[in-house]
Amino acid sequence: MGCGGSRADAIEPRYYESWTRETESTWLTYTDSDAPPSAAAPDSGPEAGGLHSGMLEDGLPSNGVPRSTAPGGIPNPEKKTNCETQCPNPQSLSSGPLTQKQNGLQTTEAKRDAKRMPAKEVTINVTDSIQQMDRSRRITKNCVN
């Protein structure tokens, strides 16, 4: 460009006008991006050369994971594993509500003076076993995977 001008000045000239309510409402009206894409381009379907919403040009969904369908076009259901034999729900075996008791939980927190050191010092000691107890204080089976 030369002589002190920048490329941005040539592309987008600056308008020095006073900011009024009219210019603010105009700016807010024309800069809202909340309008749905279907209202902005009604003929953007696949017949008009557009794309389905959520689909890319190569037919993949927009998240990049190919959709798996059965030969009949029905989506494959996810395989679910039966984990009842591994760890039965103790609530279904007992009649009362359960509480968890953690043995050996010790928490020490020392707060330093803000002028000396603005940090907290936290020490947490937790034992490995967490035992579940029902209302009558009976210990139920531990479920350890």
Swiss-Prot record:
Main location group: cytoplasm
Start-end of Low complexity biased regions: 32-46
Post-translational modification: Palmitoylation and myristoylation target the protein to the lipid rafts.
Biased segments, Basic and acidic residues type: 109-119
Claim: Membrane is one of the keywords in the record: yes
S-palmitoyl cysteine lipid attachment residues: 3
Subcellular location: Cytoplasm; Synapse, Synaptosome; Membrane raft; Postsynaptic density
Residue intervals passing through the bilayer: none
UniProt keyword annotation of Cytoplasm present: yes
Role according to the record: May play a synaptic role at the postsynaptic lipid rafts possibly through interaction with CAMK2A.
Protein name stated in the entry: Brain and acute leukemia cytoplasmic protein
Organism: Homo sapiens (Human)
